[in-house]
Amino acid sequence: MKKLIKLLFISLLITGCVYQEQQKKLIKTNVLKQQEVAYISNQRKIKNEIQTVINQEYDLPVIGNNRLIVIDAGHQAHGNSEQEPIGPGASETKAKVTTGATGVSTGKLESLINLEVALKLQQKLEMSGYQVKMIRTSQDVNISNRERAMVANDSNCAAFIRLHCNSADSSSASGTLTIAPSINNPYCSQIAEASYNLSKCVVDNICSQTGSKNRGVMINDTMSGINWCKVPVTIVEMGFLSNYEEDRLLSDSSYQDKIVNGIVKGINEYME
């Protein structure tokens, strides 16, 4: 009996020692994990701080966790023929803002179509978890292209979406395109790459949703609404109002929904 008690005591003693050792290892492991998490968190913080300094120093667009999208429904009910520089420090000028094109079959103003799509896009983006800032929500405004870009710049948005409709001398011209600045743009070359990527994502996804002819990304350095930008920007030419069929489609609510779905998918792809 004494031997049995002795063996039991020794067994309990060994078990206790093993348990204590396991607890020490567990504590050590947890401490190491906490140190690792703290290190990774600190490295991310340092990386973000460095990126912020770089962005401020070189005036680069900030994306990161930014979920703010600025939407500009191009044009307005009444144009403003007063002149403004096409870019910072430019001697060349353009009208501050025009009324835009008119549908060849519907007679509908481009500015109104742009606004209809913009309001739908706002709703869809907000439902998708984005913050949205609108340049205009009505036709009765007087906002120049430079002023529109300044609103986007001041917001430091992740993307500036400028909605337009196209027009051409030939009624056979059709399709969707986007516009971005070149890497040699004298006013906003720092956003050229990001703007191209945004433009490519948007036009590809719109055409995938609508079946419209994909005219790709047009590079243009003469657009005031682009040249004044410091944030990634794209002008979306949704279709041709000079084309009888596309003009009707651009006023069709279900077709507008397809355009909106394409833009949202494009923004999602760009933000990944």
Regions inferred by a protein language model and the residue ranges of each:
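Catalytic-site microenvironment of enzymes
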Residues: 2-272
